Every structure is written in structure tokens, then in C-alpha cells.
Amino acid sequence: GIYFIVAKPTNEGETGIARYNDIQIRNCSLDTVNRWGIAVGYTYQWRQFTTGALSDATMAKYASSNVVIENNYLNHVGGDAITTMYLDRPLVQYNVSENAAEQINTKDYSQQQPSLDANGNENGKQWVNAGRVAAAIWPWKCKNAIFQYNECFRTLHASDGNGDGQPWDADYGDGTNYQYNYSHGNTASTIMFCGPESINNTFRYNISQYEDMGPLDPAGNSGNCQVYNNTFYIKEGLNTIWHRSHGNGGPVDMENNIFYFAGNTPVAVNDWNPSGNKTYSNNLYYNVSTYPNDANPVKVNAGTQVLVNAGSGPDSVADDKSARRHEDPTATTVFDGYKLAENSPAINAGKVVVDRNGYTIDHDFFGHKITAVPEIGAAESDAVAALVLRSNVYTVTGTNVSDLPKNTTVEDFLNNVIVDTGVTVTIKEGETELKGTDIVKGGATITLSYEGMESVTYTVVASSDKELKGCFYEVKGTEVRVP
């Protein structure tokens, strides 16, 4: 495969700490390779990365940076397909993996592995299963790694010696984000959150289909872990959303997900909350007879049309071996069976999610902008059920809008508010309609209208530009007294 390591310089005092900057691995095809397909960044400075939280100072000094891995195809990889190691904010996108972990099994790993000293000399033996783990596309000791628009099929041998077998694995690292990915037919769970130094994870707007185990594998992760707006199509015969044997002890917060259990017989789901540290809010549960403690569940019987054609996602790679694009909301894609059906109970049934890891929530799996009232699952829709205005910039309380900076124009305002597609927004000062570069001042009204619905009006509360106005004031110690 392709393997980049950072070796110790002969004279580090003279040359400085070694690290890569600006590695781009693009448009490569790797077929039938040994332990790794693509791996970038293993460093002699690994001892600087021994905590869960990775500071920006540590990353700037010791981590490699500006790494992009995209548009690669990997097949029949002996172990892991793509791994980023000790990298600051790597971007891994539009890659396709199939048949990873081909050698991670009890036949190929049937003897004890050698243990090596710092000079590479054998100094003993490890257990037979040492190193017998491989997932497809994942980070190790990276900060704010983004994995998006990747596809993964049939990561192998989770039931035959491979301790992993997932398509995605938020392993030891800080701020890992998996978004807009598609996986099918992998032998373990969809996503593993692995170990106590796996923190601040985001898993959102992904589609999973027919994995051999339940979709989630919180294998001892700690701290913040958000799973929201995913669609999990769980194959018939499974009665859990968890990995079969990893214990599932890590915390996970689940919001706006579709848990779609295939088949016609309601599934008695086993243990929605192992270790008692899982939370649920606004998820949709299809074809189940037992439910978790969800703050606002949507319970759906088998036969209800939730998705256009559930289970119809691709089961193999594209003919040209490339990742299939799906970020244009006007385009037809092979994933369209996972768009929401007309009158789906998932439409306008979601909650407004705040990503605690600081990732902006812009669009869904298909590139559709997130609307004022979000949907449940990986797909948004154009359906309008209520006239609602919200913003990630201004404060909306009831029908009042506040915290507009001074001299906010109509154009600025419209760029910073969110309404459903097709809703008309009219801004007025008194009876005069404001447009373009007109300034939106306190007292202005914002009216939302949509055909067949009663309009809703919001009012702008006087701008809080947070500037200290001209006045006499008294300074005493650390206090400023304003009359």
C-alpha cells in the first residue's frame, strides 16, 4: 500500500521536529495489498499524544497537517483500508473501500506474532490475536478529522477473528466527524467509537444498510459523542442496535435518527441502553415492539411509508470504482430510495440539533439545506408543515428576533436566517417593504407566508450591538459604573 511515516531526524536540534505538511493522495487504485491500503502520519513523537483531548498547541508542534486523501479505490486490502495517524484536521473524502480486512482472520493469524524492541529486533512473542483487528476508514490520534462522501462495502471477518470489521471507526482522537457516508454489508457495526481516548465525536447524515451487526459500537469511548440524523436500515434477523460482543459501554447521545428494522414482524429490541449512559431524542423507530426512553419518539408500524424505497441502496461499488456523488439536491442518485416518502412521519418531526463539537449543520446527505423544522433521518424534504424562522446567528425567542448587529441589511438578515424551502419572507418597516441594502432596525416586522397557510409575523427587537454608548461613567477597580 501507500504508507507515510515520520522518522526521527539525525539531529532534531538542528533541523527541528519532523512533521509532514501538505500531503495529497488522490485518484489512486490499490488492489490486493497487504496490511494497510493507505496510512499517513505515524510519528516518532507519538508520546506527545497520550491524552484524549489534543490541544491545538500539541497539534501545531508535533502533528502533520494539510493532509487530503480523496478519490481513491481500495479492494482486497489485507487489513485497514485508510488510516490517518497523528494528523491535524485531515480531510478524507470520496474514497471507496471493499473487501478490507481480508487477512484479519484466524487462518492468517494462526501463530504468535513477534514482539520487537525499539531497534526492530525480536524480543519475545505476542498473543496469537495481537494486531488481529482492522476497520476500513478511520483515524488514530487525529484532531478534527473529517470523513465524508466515502463508500464502504464488506469489511471482512468480524465473526472470524477480526476484532473490528466496521466501515467507520472513530478511534483514539479528538473531534472526529463522519458525515455523508454510505456503507453496506460490513461484518460488524456501522460505526465504532473506540476506547477512552476517543472523545468529541460527531456521526451525522450517514446511511447504513444491511450490516451484520447493529449499527452502533461504543467500545469504551468517553465524553461527548453525538449521533444525529442518520438512517440505519437494520437487516432482518437482528434485534439490537449494538455490536454483538464489545460491551457497548461508552456514552452516546442519539437525536433525529431513523432506526429501520427490516421485515414485517415487530422486533423486540434487546437492551436499548447498555451501561445506562445512552440518551434518545426525536428518533423514529420502525417495526419494533420495545422502545428506549426517548424524549419525543416517533413510533411507526411495519408497512408505513417512511422512505421512498427502503433497503434499495447499492450493494456493490460503481462500475468506474468511484464514489457516487449525491451532494446536488436536484440530481437523481442511486441512494434516492432513502429520501423521505410523501407524507412520511419523519417529515418536520425532528428537533433543532446543536453540534457540541462545533461543526456547522448546513445540509443533508443529498445536499439539501437544513430547513427551519428539520426532518428525522439523513434526508431533508421540501414539505412545509409550519411557518418557523430560526437562526444560528441571531436570537429567536417566540416571535421576537434580537441580537442583530448594527447596520444589518436585508441581504445580511436573509443570509443568516433559516426557513423552509418555498416560504416567502417579507421584511417591513411600518408599511414600507425593505429590500437589498436597506437597514433592518428595531421594530421591523418579518412575515413568513406560504400558499394555503396562515402567515406568521416576527418582530425585530432593537439591535444589541454591544457597543458602549457615549456617556459619563465611573471606573473603580475592576468595575465600570454607567448611570
Report each predicted region and the residues it spans:
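Edge beta-strands of extracellular beta-sandwich domains
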Residues: 454-462
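C-terminal accessory segments
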Residues: 298-383, 400-406, 482
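Parallel beta-helix/beta-solenoid
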Residues: 15, 19-20, 25, 33-35, ...
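Predominantly extracellular beta-rich ligand-binding scaffolds that present long acidic/polar faces
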Residues: 177-183, 195-337
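Solvent-exposed, low-complexity, repeat-rich "mucin-like" stalks and linkers
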Residues: 385-422, 467-483
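Serine/threonine-rich, repeat-prone extracellular segments and beta-strand-based repeat modules
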Residues: 420-453
